[in-house]
Amino acid sequence: MASVIPASNRSMRSDRNTYVGKRFVHVKNPYLDLMDEDILYHLDLGTKTHNLPAMFGDVKFVCVGGSPNRMKAFALFMHKELGFEEAEEDIKDICAGTDRYCMYKTGPVLAISHGMGIPSISIMLHELIKLLHHARCCDVTIIRIGTSGGIGIAPGTVVITDIAVDSFFKPRFEQVILDNIVTRSTELDKELSEELFNCSKEIPNFPTLVGHTMCTYDFYEGQGRLDGALCSFSREKKLDYLKRAFKAGVRNIEMESTVFAAMCGLCGLKAAVVCVTLLDRLDCDQINLPHDVLVEYQQRPQLLISNFIRRRLGLCD
């Protein structure tokens, strides 16, 4: 696909957002070099069956989100925002041979679904990072966009994560590897979060803040909900926990950010998490927004990332 940047604008700027740095994606596995073929099973791709550099070598922005339909909608939205003339029907699911994830590409933007929870996004990230490595991509920015529950903030607020924390409000991801617990850092790229926050200021009526995001292993008891099939705590215990989370700097809760931050950081990817809140967990546990309001809220992270990408590519007025 042709460059989205007009020929007259293709000289890159000399500020910190330039692509000239050639920051490649690193895999931390010496055994990959010994393999004749790498099959990315859950993506229905492979190093012998596909020309990954030709297919993905120009990727600069990767956006991941839980819902397949939402990621398809984001890809179609970016296709229009970047001014491509090809019909939307030309944007096909690259992972159509599998029912695990979906993947769409438009210009330098790759959109991929990751399902719900740490195990699902972890599998996708392993294969995505290897894909970017095999494709020899460089200077890639990866952003998770999604929905979340807020703590002490109004529904519809967009939270840009500075640090992902676990259920103990600690900036760490604990991975069980063989019979050991390995602890990894969950810090995200500070300059990227600041850049995204500055982009949000250009959008009217767009409440945004930077704060900690708590990542849990469960949607119900793990997030202190009283409405699951099981509940082993009181309303008072729930509120005490959420208030302590707020005091620790947590502004929203989801289920993927710690492993996302840890894996991207280890592999040299500049990463960010941008989630809209659908409710204030201090007030309620269930999402009861009108459908049109819910749809508009869900589009807010997409709108911010579109503005960010267009600005990076020099396409903003």
Curated annotation (Swiss-Prot):
Keyword terms, alphabetized: Disulfide bond, Glycosyltransferase, Redox-active center, Transferase
Ranges in coiled-coil conformation: none
Enzyme class (EC, first level): transferase
Activity regulation field: A conditional disulfide bridge can form within the protein that dislocates a critical phosphate-coordinating arginine Arg-100 away from the active site, disabling the enzyme.
Record GO biological process: CMP catabolic process; dCMP catabolic process; nucleoside metabolic process; UMP catabolic process; UMP salvage; uridine catabolic process; uridine metabolic process
GO terms for MF: deoxyuridine phosphorylase activity; identical protein binding; uridine phosphorylase activity
Binding-site positions, phosphate: 66, 100, 144-147
Source taxon at top rank: Eukaryota
GO cellular component: cytosol; type III intermediate filament
CDD domains: UP_hUPP-like
Pfam families per the UniProt record, alphabetical: PNP_UDP_1
Binding site for uridine: 148-149, 223-225
Family per similarity comment: Belongs to the PNP/UDP phosphorylase family.
Quaternary structure annotation from Swiss-Prot or TrEMBL: Homodimer.
Name of the protein in question: Uridine phosphorylase 2
